[in-house]
């Protein structure tokens, strides 16, 4: 009888800078209850289904999009951990253009490098 592969449950973590501040959590806290619920639902889908429901941007950065009441939101994240079971939320913003702005991608890459350099805190 064949064994099923071990399932390593995914979970979201939020990047925090050296002062302990999470820009993504602050962004989410400032949203309306309805828009925050939409973002959390999209994040839950990624947690349950993996990156196949996200968009690969470049290097190790992925994007999840969701529709709020009047806006579209984007969360940039990376997979971390031994089994890539940590979904590290790096940047969040309102979608204003079709393409993800390069400045947002660079910021996510910088935050990922910072997180890794500080021992993945």
What are these regions (language model features)?
Residues 1-72, 81-86, 93-121:
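Basic, Lys/Arg-enriched alpha-helical interface segments
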